């Protein structure tokens, strides 16, 4: 399951008002899928959440930038680096073949400003 840090951490870290409805919806999806982990495991199915920061080059980042000029630059400065689509896609692909973390979560990019 691919999500954003802004959605994954929505309960502990506020996000931009423009993104909050999306973040809450994505978190609800993540929670619903996490509830199924025991049943999936019984069937031999692995599950991992891949959470990434704002991804440069996506329509979501572009729309957030239009609604909140400077959002991408501000997040890049705070995180030190933002992944582009190809870089994040490579991380998602790795999540499919590498061992599943014990908490079923692969965090891609800086999370120091999320709690």
Language model regions located:
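Catalytic loop of short-chain dehydrogenase/reductase
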Residues: 1-42, 54-58, 64-67
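C-terminal helical subdomain
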Residues: 43-53, 64-115
């Amino acid at each position: 399951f691919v999500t954003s840090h802004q959605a994954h951490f929505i309960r502990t870290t506020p996000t931009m008002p423009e993104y909050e409805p999306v973040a809450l919806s994505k978190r609800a999806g993540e929670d619903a899928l996490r509830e199924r982990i025991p049943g999936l495991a019984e069937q031999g199915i692995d599950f991992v959440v891949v959470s990434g920061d704002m991804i440069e080059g996506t329509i979501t980042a572009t729309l957030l930038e239009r609604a909140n000029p400077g959002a991408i630059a501000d997040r890049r400065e705070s995180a030190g680096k933002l992944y582009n689509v190809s870089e994040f896609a490579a991380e998602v692909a790795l999540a499919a073949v590498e061992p599943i973390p014990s908490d079923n979560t692969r965090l891609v990019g800086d999370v120091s400003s999320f709690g």
